[in-house]
Amino acid sequence: MIRPMRKDDYSKVYELWLSCKGMGLNDVDDSENGISRFLNRNPSTCFVAEIKGELIGAIMAGNDGRRGYIYHTAVHPSHQNRGIGSSLVNTVLEALKQQGISKTALVVFDRNKNGNAFWEKLGFTERNDLIYRNKSLVDMTRIET
């Protein structure tokens, strides 16, 4: 079952993220406070997947009014390759479409081979003409998964 993500899902979602290799987490944006802020801004584009009450998948997305952005897509390793990730993505894409968004983007680490294959299978294309840049405005610590 896929349902909207709630703030009280945080501890289970964070535990899920830690179980998945290749997640890009940090101690500021992915803290309980950081995720709470994200959910306040994007309440209708963040979802979890459950089986018999066990949280086994999650996806977060938002938009800037023009483009959608997908973040932190994860399915517990013991439940991967069963269509759960695809269902989460399709759910979030439909939610973005309902908000008038016509295109979406995401970032995947180059070393995340399984993640890149997953997104390619779903029709997401790689852009070789772009360089992704970012700048931290506060001190934060990266959390490796």
What residue ranges belong to the model's regions?
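Conserved GNAT acetyl-CoA-binding A-motif
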Residues: 96-108
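A short beta-loop-alpha structural element at the N-terminal edge
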Residues: 1-15
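Conserved beta-strand-loop-alpha-helix junction that forms the acyl-donor binding cleft
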Residues: 106-115, 134-137
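A short, internal acetyl-CoA/4′-phosphopantetheine-binding micro-motif in the GNAT/acyltransferase core
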Residues: 50, 73-80, 108-109
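Conserved acetyl-CoA-binding loop-helix of GNAT-fold acetyltransferases
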Residues: 75, 81-94, 121
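A conserved beta-turn-beta hairpin within the catalytic core of GNAT-like acetyltransferases
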Residues: 62-71, 80, 126-130
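Conserved beta-strand in the GNAT
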Residues: 48, 54-62, 69-74
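A short helix-loop-beta-strand connector motif used in the catalytic cores of GNAT acetyltransferases and
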Residues: 36-48, 69
